[in-house]
Amino acid sequence: MKYTLVVMTGPENGMGHDRARGFAQALAQQGHRLQRVFFYGDGVRAAQGETPQCQQFWTTLAESEGSELVLCSASAERYGLTEPVPPFTLMGLGALMEAGFDSDRIISFD
């Protein structure tokens, strides 16, 4: 199955982000395809250098699984993330809509 995850909480703001990371690992271990992780709202902070272990987790996952890491452009702008470090990219909400067509499941974490 092909999955897209929507992460709406920051790395240190509760269990939502931790659950997303655990779910992403479980998908990889079970042979599912994680197509895209869409970071929205406070979730875009996963791409900031102030949480290097979180940033490294998603980067490693993207490289090993071939997943896209997408930051909502409006949310990223609010946090001053105008030039994210690859493999994180900026896209609008249209990328999330597109994921709805390309994925079998979209799971959100907040």
Question: Whereabouts are the PLM-identified features?
Answer:
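Hydrophobic anchor at the start of a short beta-strand
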Residues: Y3, L34-Q35, L69
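Short, glycine-rich nucleotide/cofactor-binding loops
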Residues: Y3-D18, G43-E50
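Histidine-anchored nucleotide/phosphate-binding helix
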Residues: G16-H32
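Charged helix-capping and loop-helix junction motifs
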Residues: R19-G22, T51-F57, T89-L90
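A short beta-strand-loop structural module common to alpha/beta enzyme folds
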Residues: Q35-G43
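A glycine-rich helix N-cap at a beta->alpha junction
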Residues: P52-G80
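C-terminal structural segments of small proteins and small subunits
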Residues: Y79-F109
